[in-house]
């Protein structure tokens, strides 16, 4: 499972001109699922994300977690995180999980965050989405449960 985490002051996602999710301070997270992923990967990354210290303390050091600042998550499914660009000019997405399996693990990931007390807003799985955000810092982190 892969995540691209962006620290934001605000973020929202629209599907067909309807806002399906919006947050203020927190993380906008792109979530990608591959064939080998299990619930173990989900829980590992949900825990890591909840406790990742990339919010600044009073001294300007990245020392506070999402839980510390009571931030929210805008979670957006993103199969293209498994795009392979090594051959040709068009990405190959064969490493991305099939939609049914990916959606189940994506929903499990969001549930795991909610169980930690984190407010989670989402896009719509498999839909064409427009994501808007204000990246704070900017701070962008790549996380992979296998690496």
Swiss-Prot record:
It is an enzyme of class 3 (hydrolase). One of its GO terms (biological process) is D-amino acid catabolic process. It catalyses: glycyl-tRNA(Ala) + H2O = tRNA(Ala) + glycine + H(+); a D-aminoacyl-tRNA + H2O = a tRNA + a D-alpha-amino acid + H(+). It is found in: Cytoplasm. It comes from the Bacteria. A motif (Gly-cisPro motif, important for rejection of L-amino acids) lies at residues 137-138. InterPro entries: Daa-tRNA_deacyls_DTD, DTD-like_sf. Its EC number is 3.1.1.96. Keywords: Cytoplasm, Hydrolase, RNA-binding, tRNA-binding. One of its GO terms (cellular component) is cytoplasm. The keyword Nucleotide-binding does not apply. SUPFAM superfamilies: DTD-like. One of its GO terms (molecular function) is Ser(Gly)-tRNA(Ala) hydrolase activity. Belongs to the DTD family. A Gly-cisPro motif from one monomer fits into the active site of the other monomer to allow specific chiral rejection of L-amino acids. An aminoacyl-tRNA editing enzyme that deacylates mischarged D-aminoacyl-tRNAs. Also deacylates mischarged glycyl-tRNA(Ala), protecting cells against glycine mischarging by AlaRS. Acts via tRNA-based rather than protein-based catalysis; rejects L-amino acids rather than detecting D-amino acids in the active site. By recycling D-aminoacyl-tRNA to D-amino acids and free tRNA molecules, this enzyme counteracts the toxicity associated with the formation of D-aminoacyl-tRNA entities in vivo and helps enforce protein L-homochirality. Homodimer. This is D-aminoacyl-tRNA deacylase. It comes from Bacillus pumilus (strain SAFR-032). The gene is dtd.
